[in-house]
UniProtKB/Swiss-Prot annotation:
Gene3D superfamilies: Periplasmic binding protein-like II, Porphobilinogen deaminase, C-terminal domain. The modification S-(dipyrrolylmethanemethyl)cysteine is found at residue 242. The lineage of its organism: Bacteria, Pseudomonadati, Pseudomonadota, Gammaproteobacteria, Alteromonadales. Belongs to the HMBS family. It catalyses: 4 porphobilinogen + H2O = hydroxymethylbilane + 4 NH4(+). PANTHER family: PORPHOBILINOGEN DEAMINASE. GO terms for molecular function: hydroxymethylbilane synthase activity. This is Porphobilinogen deaminase. It comes from Shewanella baltica (strain OS155 / ATCC BAA-1091). The porphobilinogen subunits are added to the dipyrromethane group. Monomer. Tetrapolymerization of the monopyrrole PBG into the hydroxymethylbilane pre-uroporphyrinogen in several discrete steps.
Amino acid sequence: MSENRIRIATRKSPLAMWQAEFVKAELERIHPGIVVELLPMSTKGDVILDTPLAKVGGKGLFVKELEVAMLDDLADIAVHSMKDVPVDFPEGLGLEVICEREDPRDAFVSNLYKSISELPLGATVGTSSLRRQCQIRASRPDLIIKDLRGNVGTRLAKLDNGEYDAIILAAAGLIRLKLSERIASFISAEESLPANGQGAVGIECRINDERVKALLAPLEHLETRYRVLAERAMNTRLEGGCQVPIGAFAEIDGDEMTLRGLVGNPDGSEIIEGVITGPKTEATQLGVALAEELLSKGAKTILDAVYAKA
């Protein structure tokens, strides 16, 4: 392998390609003369669009083929949305870099209404996320929530075709695809706690590839890593897959981190919440401690029921 060449495995969706192009541009900016190649690939998660993710294996479906490419030395790195990255990595691979986070909030998207509170009784909202479903149903049990799969463009087209009165998407994806004008309003973390890692981009590579790790190192954003570590640690302790009604959101003020978390029944009938504050350098411990608090309040009963249905 040439010392100044990196191959990036990426999904083919516009958002995945944006993320890969972002990393490519950053590497080229930091390392003049480097040759960065993109290897677009289809994953099972991109192909199976007619079934809710929870029923076909969760969001790990979006990364497996990329990981195989790295293990087979067809690619050097893979670029992921952190909210799609499973807790465990295949032997020989690891998460080397977490880039600076984009806006982590959910976005309310509608051609007719400005916010969830403006929606009329019985309006139809599109989202496949159990996390979003439980929080919307808790505040607006009258709303009809329908599954929504596909890439961002497909989801917006379904809204424009009148299949939904509104849809909920990650704000970061719309911002990155220069579709901010489609956002009717940003949903505050208080109203809809984001998914762990939402808005952050991670780079996975072979853990023994020191050449690639050295090239990637300048892309690391330490504050984002602390935040995402706390959120993922909470999710891991809860034994949460990617398609679960779990919200986690960490914020940092100076050296102090505040982590909020929730587990909700997808029907909105019960939401268990907690908050913890401590040193940002103890991000993982804070995540585990908050998970323990949620479990002590009954989170396991909710999660067991969700897994039983999946």
